[in-house]
C-alpha cells in the first residue's frame, strides 16, 4: 500500500467522506452553552441545561417535570442539580391565568429557582441538589418577568 492510500483507496478520496461524517456527527451532537452566575454568597457558578424529563413515579415530587442542570463552582467538580416543577403548581398557575405555561415560561421559572438557590444556599453541592418550584414561587417568578 502506498503512502497516500488506505485500504487500496487514495486517502484524498476518503477526505470528503470524513468531512461529511464529522459534519453529520456535529449536527447530531447537542452543543451546550456554559453560562455563569455570580451568587450573593460569593460563589461564581457555571452551569448548563442538560434537559428535562418526567420525574420518576417513585420520586416524592411526582407527578412533575424534572429539569436537570450540570453545575460547578470550582471548575473541577461538576454535579447535577434537579429542579422539579410539579404538575399541581403548573395547574394552579393555569387555573389562575386561564392558559397553560409555555415551555419557555416553565424553563424561565425553573432557571430563576436555580438562581435563587445560588443566592441563598451556601453549599449548593451539599444542600441544593434537589429544588422545587411550588405554586407561590411560580407565580412570583413569572410575575417578576411580566408573564401573565
How does the language model describe each region?
Residues 1-17, 23:
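Short, low-complexity, charge-dense intrinsically disordered segments
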Residues 25-148:
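Extended, alpha-helix-rich binding/interface surfaces that flank or overlap catalytic cores
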Residues 18-19, 127:
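Generic alpha-helical structural signal
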